C-alpha cells in the first residue's frame, strides 16, 4: 500500500472511530461522572466512572487512543507527501510533519496519565491516583492542540496551493480556515477562563 493510500484510509476511518469511542461509547457505556464538579471531586468522579467497568474502560480508551494516533499519523503522512523544494507551501508542510508527531507524543502522554491513575486506584493508592488523574484532566489542553491545529491548517493550506483540482483546493482552504478558527477558539477559551475554574 502506498503512503498516499494509507494516509487517505487513516484520515477517513480514524476520526470516525475516535469520535464514536470518546463521544458516544464512553459516555453511554461508562459514564462521565456528575456534571459541574471541579478539582479533586472531578478527578475522583472520573476515576470512579471508569473503574466501575475497568476492563471495558481499558478497551474503549485503547481503541479510541489508537484511532487518535492513526489520525495523527495520517496527517503526518499527508504533510510528508506534499513536501518538495519546488512545491508551493513546502515550508508549511515541513513544519507540520515535525509538529504533528510532537503533538501526538504529548497526547499519548496525557492519555497515559489516565491509565496510570487507574492502576494506582486499583492498587488502593487513592492519593496518587487522584493526583495523576488531576494532571490528566488538564494536561494537553492548550499547547498540544495549538500544534495540532497549526499542523492541520498548514497541511490544508499547502494542499490547496499545490492542487489544481477545484474540489481538493476548496477542501484544503476550508480545512485551513477551520483550523484557524479552532485555534483561536481554544486559545480564547483558556485565556478567558475564570481563575476559579482552574482549581
Residue ranges and their predicted role:
Residues 148-167:
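Alpha-helical transmembrane segments in multipass membrane proteins, preferentially the mid-helix core
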Residues 47-68:
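Interfacial helix-start motif at the membrane-water boundary
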Residues 85-104, 171:
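Interfacial segments of alpha-helical transmembrane regions
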Residues 189-195:
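Conserved small/polar residues in nucleotide/adenosyl-binding loops
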Residues 1-15, 90-97:
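Alpha-helical transmembrane segments and their helix-start/interface "positive-inside/aromatic belt" motifs
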